[in-house]
From Swiss-Prot:
Annotated positions binding Mg(2+): D17
Protein name: S-adenosylmethionine synthase
Residues in the signal sequence: none
Alphabetized UniProt keyword annotations: ATP-binding, Cytoplasm, Magnesium, Metal-binding, Nucleotide-binding, One-carbon metabolism, Potassium, Transferase
Keyword tRNA-binding listed: no
Organism of derivation: Salmonella typhimurium (strain LT2 / SGSC1412 / ATCC 700720)
Cofactor: binding comment: Binds 2 divalent ions per subunit.
Subcellular location: Cytoplasm
Pathway assigned in UniProt: Amino-acid biosynthesis; S-adenosyl-L-methionine biosynthesis; S-adenosyl-L-methionine from L-methionine: step 1/1
EC primary class: transferase
Amino acid sequence: MAKHLFTSESVSEGHPDKIADQISDAVLDAILQQDPKARVACETYVKTGMVLVGGEITTSAWVDIEEITRNTVREIGYVHSDMGFDANSCAVLSAIGKQSPDINQGVDRADPLEQGAGDQGLMFGYATNETDVLMPAPITYAHRLVQRQAEVRKNGTLPWLRPDAKSQVTFQYDDGKIVGIDAVVLSTQHAEDIDQKSLQEAVMEEIIKPILPSEWLNTSTKFFINPTGRFVIGGPMGDCGLTGRKIIVDTYGGMARHGGGAFSGKDPSKVDRSAAYAARYVAKNIVAAGLADRCEIQVSYAIGVAEPTSIMVETFGTEKVPAEQLILLVREFFDLRPYGLIQMLDLLHPIYKETAAYGHFGRENFPWEKTDKAQLLRDAAGLK
């Protein structure tokens, strides 16, 4: 592939699907705070004037679902009816059951190391050296644009902004290297009284220019700011939101494959989430070690079985050591059994609500973003 374009999108914390993700993970965090061994599968649905929280939860903890929901919506910024959604007046419904005992008997073990996977499935992790956080540039900058939108909305720089927003960035590549940005799309919900011209100028100056590196912008870069001309109705009034509907936004923006499992609302016994984090950790350490420029890891599981059913390493021809050696290094330095990866990444803590907007990867405060195995891998591979 010589010259080509690649596009990724992101959505803000006020997007309906992301509201749902954040509520699900806020419930998970509140439970893990009291009961680290809880089994949680929490799903959320949001629509005009209402939130429905459901799922299967087995725990000794008690949490106030309604209070957690209202606080989460309030923090996002939906605090008045003219925004189409109000944390103080929306209805909060709960439909929570317990996890099936048939699943429990496959997961729980007398020996924790033999803890089985909570379900079958395949998960992918990815890393590339095209950015400082070892993530693909298109999704990295799409996230940063909507993060900036939230920042200038909340700090009062652009007080007419509202919580719902989407971004999309198209990068130009030549022989695998970034040569520029071809197109930028940013759509943001706004108050009724701001005109289109003022909005476009402010978004360009306060959101786009501070985030996108000037060396990647040129006279042919196309900018689409609120291209429909109006975005007053947004959030749950504009669209219903569901947990787990933004799995590509949550991961690599389409640059890597995806096993199909969503993350939010799931405790770490669910390998959909924990093994995807572990696969990112493995891929990132391989790239950080200089063993490859790009790396994709696939891992798969059978329900109730501890050992992965498969591990695959793909380096797209960028490897500096033989592929067979990479597989051996992964097996030697990373414990990808469910209990092993939970311990390796210290996952039994309330760290998940923060993951639920702006991507689960590429933010250094998460334990799966550490590169503490990079030097070990490099030494074991015999690289100077």
